[in-house]
Amino acid sequence: EEIANGKWPLEGAEREAWKSHPKLGAEYLRTSYHFPAVVSAGVMMHHEWYNGEGYPIGKSGDDIPLYARIIKVTDSYDAMISKRPGREQLSPADAIEYMMAMAGAEFAPKLVNIFLRRMAVYPIGCEVLLSNGQHCGEEF
């Protein structure tokens, strides 16, 4: 938590400590809560990239467990639209645009397509300006 809420970008030992969180999380789920191996493997590999550039192992494509590929898509979207140290918060539309651009590199293309078909571009509660100049949203 101290690293997550600290100064970003991380360097040196802090960066390496942060990169160990998938393995630590998977081990915690396995030993403390007896989650099935398929779940803990998904947690451990949720920072793997579809093209093999991720961590902690460097797996690619369908060698990355399905749970990990799903967590990668959903966790990345949440991270992009949330306020986090060291990165700009994106609008849902910008996050979706990024995910579409990175499908096949960072993300599994089929899972991005499934996620985006089920995801609203304008989540509940956001303000939308209509072409006639009217505002729509929860507050209006």
Kindly give the residue locations of the regions a language model identified.
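Histidine- and acidic-residue-rich, metal-dependent catalytic cores
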Residues: 1-140
